[in-house]
């Protein structure tokens, strides 16, 4: 299967750090859920910006549907019809006085009829669980609400690829659930999702593929295989997800996928521990609280 979006030998950086990314290769298939992992400053946001057409690389190429993107104004406008990026800080993407105006900004710039713009706004807000915010002023929203509205603005463009920089950061558990539910529905509808995150457990549970940014390059593969690479995980300053750590500690052939499976996996070891403890407790003198004759005199 050919990649919908790809980086080939990509080099990117800034004047004070010219090679944040050095000879990066990445291929993202249509409909993929890809989690982008890495330490702070590793280059995750830089890579997203290059793929979105917001930052021109100094070397290599970004391709969409097998063709290099055109970095001219017209070419970038066309690219952004297909690839949208949501920044980590929602305030960097909220410009209008109220929510509906803000979400409608992108579709209006596509030259759509007002009825179509309205339909897209309602659809995107509903998908993000934010339809009740449509008439609210953006400055009145909580951080989590602003994050959902900023995401709705990108969703309203109906892109082929939606890229999100730390979409669950700063959200409460309900907000995380709502965001994940929205992303799942988007992928079910065929949207390709690329999520930069520090949440390794989320990446393991949610993603079809993982790409780890480490030492200015990218390692891409299946989540379980890549996150089981102890050396790569350590060099990337990541934590081993608890399901993989538990599977390794117990010698399991498959990682537990949820808490119930983890408890079931632990049951034999806990049973053996309890039996050993009970046996030891039944031996005279084995209880530390037992007093000797000398102590009781």
Swiss-Prot record:
Q: Which organism is it from?
A: Propionibacterium freudenreichii subsp. shermanii
> Which residues does the record give as ATP binding sites?
38-45
Q: Which GO terms describe its cellular component?
A: ATP-binding cassette (ABC) transporter complex
Output one GO BP term: cobalt ion transport
Source species, domain of life: Bacteria
User: What does the protein in this record do?
Assistant: Probably part of an ABC transporter complex. Responsible for energy coupling to the transport system.
What Pfam families has UniProt attached to this entry?
ABC_tran (PF00005)
What protein does this entry describe?
Putative ABC transporter ATP-binding protein in cobA 5'region
Could you say which EC number(s) this protein's record lists? Answer: 7.-.-.-
Q: Which family does it belong to?
A: Belongs to the ABC transporter superfamily.
Q: Which residues form the ABC transporter domain?
A: 5-240
UniProt GO molecular function: ATP binding; ATP hydrolysis activity; ATPase-coupled transmembrane transporter activity
The places in or outside the cell where this protein is found are: Cell membrane
Q: Which UniProt keywords apply?
A: ATP-binding, Cell membrane, Membrane, Nucleotide-binding, Translocase, Transport
Lineage, top ranks: Bacteria, Bacillati, Actinomycetota, Actinomycetes, Propionibacteriales
Q: Where is this region: Disordered?
A: 277-297
């Amino acid at each position: 299967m050919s990649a919908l979006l790809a980086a080939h030998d990509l080099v990117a950086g800034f004047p004070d750090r010219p090679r944040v990314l050095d000879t990066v290769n990445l291929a993202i298939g249509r409909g993929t859920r890809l989690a982008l992992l890495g330490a702070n400053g590793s280059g995750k946001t830089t890579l997203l910006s290059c793929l979105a057409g917001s930052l021109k690389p100094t070397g290599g190429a970004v391709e969409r549907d097998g063709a290099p993107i055109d970095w001219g104004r017209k070419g970038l406008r066309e690219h952004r019809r297909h690839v949208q990026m949501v920044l980590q800080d929602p305030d960097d993407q909220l410009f209008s006085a109220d929510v509906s105006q803000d979400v409608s900004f992108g579709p209006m710039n596509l030259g759509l009829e007002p009825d179509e713009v309205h339909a897209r706004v309602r659809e995107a807000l509903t998908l993000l669980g934010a339809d009740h915010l449509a008439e609210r002023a953006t400055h009145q929203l909580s951080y989590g609400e602003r994050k959902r509205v900023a995401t709705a603005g990108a969703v309203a463009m109906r892109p082929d690829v939606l890229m999100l920089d730390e979409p669950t950061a700063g959200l409460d558990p309900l907000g995380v659930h709502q965001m994940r539910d929205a992303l799942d529905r988007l992928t079910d509808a065929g949207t390709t999702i690329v999520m930069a995150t520090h949440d390794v457990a989320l990446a393991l549970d949610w993603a079809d593929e993982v790409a780890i940014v480490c030492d200015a390059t990218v390692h891409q593969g299946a989540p379980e295989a890549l996150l089981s690479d102890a050396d790569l995980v350590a060099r990337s300053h990541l934590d081993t997800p608890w399901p993989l750590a538990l599977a390794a500690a117990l010698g399991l052939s498959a990682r537990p996928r949820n808490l119930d499976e983890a408890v079931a996996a632990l049951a034999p070891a806990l049973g053996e521990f309890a039996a050993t403890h009970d046996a030891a407790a039944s031996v005279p003198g084995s209880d530390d609280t037992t007093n000797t004759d000398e102590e009781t005199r």
